């Protein structure tokens, strides 16, 4: 597994996303991923699966310090006490003393960003959180967060795949040493049936999904958290570091005009 290094922190370039996984299904997927060699797991308070994620990590034959664990603050947990209390509750559910990365899950125009960040800084100071970041922030909001927080903003987690443009944010992250984490990296399944990805994959003996993931992690400061509960797909999603796309292939794969493959919710609410 290759890593992305930002601000001196080394993070697995591919992790497991757990959105819409719950209960035993989530626990099995996380356990399988860890057995296969995944060392990065992404969850959120809003997913309702922190207990399942924590249970899987707790019994895995992997040291906790070797797993890069991310969770996210629920939209309702924005004021000072709510940030502190909800994060400590997350730690209990996750059966851990700390998370490697705590994100603000999404911008909230009626919440005070500075208050949220101040509380997150406190969590870093007390050792409950190693690093902080944001999710679904555009450049303007990301810059504001970086300007205010005492702790460096390590990452911005956003929707990104070959059919969804993030050029301005990518440039900002590369210049400022911030990791861009791509969620929904397979375009909600749209990548798996794409002819361009299929044709490129045929040259390397790779699936369209593997080509889409390779396209992401081959970019500067970019990582991805594909979701899967299938052992076969979990393993396949890891096998993207034994080939390299040409510049021409990278350009051909990027087709943001096909953003119609995104879900209706994301079309309505992104970019922020």
Please tell me what each predicted stretch does.
Residues 1-67, 270-272:
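N-terminal binding-site loop/beta-alpha segment at the start of enzyme catalytic domains
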Residues 107-272:
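Beta/alpha (TIM)-barrel catalytic core signal, keyed to glycine-rich beta->alpha loops juxtaposed to Asp/Glu
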Residues 22-24, 42-52, 76-81, 109-112, ...:
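Acidic-and-aromatic substrate-binding clefts and catalytic sites of carbohydrate-active enzymes
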Residues 9-14, 38-40, 62-67, 96-100, ...:
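Short, well-ordered coil/turn segments that N-cap beta-strands
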Residues 22-34, 79-94, 115, 142-143, ...:
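Short, acidic/polar
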Residues 72-122:
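Glycine/small-residue-rich loop that forms an oxyanion/phosphate-binding "nest" at active or ligand-binding sites
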């Amino acid at each position: 597994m290759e890593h992305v290094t930002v601000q001196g922190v080394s993070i697995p370039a591919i992790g497991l996303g757990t959105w819409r996984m719950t209960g035993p299904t989530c626990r099995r997927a996380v356990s399988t991923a860890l057995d296969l060699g995944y060392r990065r797991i992404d969850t959120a308070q809003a997913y309702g699966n922190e207990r399942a994620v924590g249970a899987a990590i707790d019994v895995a034959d992997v040291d906790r310090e070797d797993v890069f664990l991310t969770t996210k603050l629920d939209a309702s947990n924005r004021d000072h006490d709510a940030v502190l209390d909800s994060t400590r509750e997350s730690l209990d559910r996750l059966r851990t003393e700390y998370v490697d990365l705590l994100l603000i899950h999404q911008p909230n125009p009626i919440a005070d960003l500075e208050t949220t960040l101040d509380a997150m800084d406190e969590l870093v100071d007390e050792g409950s959180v190693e690093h902080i970041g944001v999710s679904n922030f555009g450049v303007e909001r990301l810059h504001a967060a970086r300007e205010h927080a005492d702790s460096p903003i390590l990452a911005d987690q956003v929707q990104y795949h070959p059919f969804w443009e993030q050029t301005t944010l990518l440039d900002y992250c590369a210049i400022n040493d911030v990791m861009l984490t791509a969620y929904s990296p397979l375009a909600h399944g749209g990548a798996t049936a794409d002819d361009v990805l299929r044709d490129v994959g045929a040259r390397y003996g790779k699936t369209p999904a593997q080509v889409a993931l390779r396209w992401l992690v081959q970019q500067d400061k970019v990582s991805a958290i594909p979701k899967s509960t299938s052992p076969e797909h979990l393993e396949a999603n890891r096998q993207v570091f034994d080939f390299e796309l040409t510049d021409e292939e990278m350009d051909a794969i990027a087709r943001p005009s096909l953003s119609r493959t995104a879900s209706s919710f994301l079309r309505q609410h992104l970019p922020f």
